């Protein structure tokens, strides 16, 4: 699947490959000692955010695209 920004598509594929490799070769085998794809994700995230702004796509709460951020607690 392509990214929201054409310029971001290669970054998305690179991140997807990195994540899938890490998930299959490390995480599923019990090694959760780190995510080697963090820098790729951050670059891809910035590219997508820029594309969304350039295309003037109205998205409330763009901060949901954070990596490793805690989810806000629900007030039930």
From Swiss-Prot:
Keyword field contains Coiled coil: yes
Q: List the disulfide bonds.
A: 8-47, 18-37
Does the keyword Disulfide bond belong to this entry? Answer: yes
Q: What residue stretches are annotated with the CHCH domain? A: 5-55
Q: Where in the cell is it found?
A: Mitochondrion; Mitochondrion intermembrane space
Q: What induces it?
A: In p53/TP53-dependent manner in response to low levels of DNA damage. Not induced when DNA damage is severe.
Site label Important for interaction with PRELID3A, positions: 27, 41
| Coiled coil stretches, renumbered | 1-52
Map motif Cx9C motif 1 onto the chain. 8-18
Provide GO CC annotations from the record: mitochondrial intermembrane space; mitochondrion; nucleoplasm; nucleus; protein-containing complex
Q: Which GO terms describe its molecular function?
A: p53 binding
TM helices/strands, residue ranges: none
Motif Cx9C motif 2 in this chain: where?
Answer: 37-47
The catalysed reaction is: a 1,2-diacyl-sn-glycero-3-phosphate(in) = a 1,2-diacyl-sn-glycero-3-phosphate(out)
Q: What family, per the record?
A: Belongs to the TRIAP1/MDM35 family.
Task: Read off the PANTHER family from this record.
Answer: TP53-REGULATED INHIBITOR OF APOPTOSIS 1
Q: What is the protein's known function? A: Involved in the modulation of the mitochondrial apoptotic pathway by ensuring the accumulation of cardiolipin (CL) in mitochondrial membranes. In vitro, the TRIAP1:PRELID1 complex mediates the transfer of phosphatidic acid (PA) between liposomes and probably functions as a PA transporter across the mitochondrion intermembrane space to provide PA for CL synthesis in the inner membrane.
Subunit-structure text: Monomer. Interacts with APAF1 and HSP70. Forms a complex with PRELID1 in the mitochondrion intermembrane space. Interacts with PRELID3A.
Q: What is this protein called?
A: TP53-regulated inhibitor of apoptosis 1
Source species of the chain: Homo sapiens (Human)
């Amino acid at each position: 699947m392509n990214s929201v920004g054409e310029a971001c598509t290669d970054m998305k594929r690179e991140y997807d490959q990195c994540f899938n490799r890490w998930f299959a070769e490390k995480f599923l085998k019990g090694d959760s000692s780190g995510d080697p794809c963090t820098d790729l994700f951050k670059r891809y995230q910035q590219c997508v955010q820029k594309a969304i702004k350039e295309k003037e796509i109205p998205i409330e709460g763009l901060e949901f695209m954070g990596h490793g951020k805690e989810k806000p607690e629900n007030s039930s």
